[in-house]
């Protein structure tokens, strides 16, 4: 009988601990999102990179929207595993915002870039970023021109280009499968100002 009481008590304590940890992780993720959005607002107003928390090794560099999907996320600098846990991020091997070349953004397939599964050719992608050279907030719209699935070693879509392009990359297939043997690539080209789509 004593064993049964200890077992029940231990089970209850374990349940409370596991529930508490789950609530803590959820609250931490929600708070991180709020802090990242605030940091982007400060960056967009001040023109100074502003980390979302004092010990962050990244900072918001852009806001990306896909209007047809209602997608609206803040893009972080440097696509490291730690950064990608908090949002889509710029690959440092690609062009910088507003610079000529292939601007490359990465995100997890089961969170930040999950909506890419339903992106279609002809969709508009809008990017806002602070241009430190011009000291102003800028916006550029892109038109999705190519969607493909490639092997992880096929990095041709991430190669530097002389033409402006926006390349979004995530693992494939979508969903929660532990394996991701391929990459899903969305390539978009800038829309000339004043041009209708």
Summary of predicted features, one role per range:
Residues 2-197:
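Solvent-exposed, non-transmembrane regions of membrane-associated and secreted proteins
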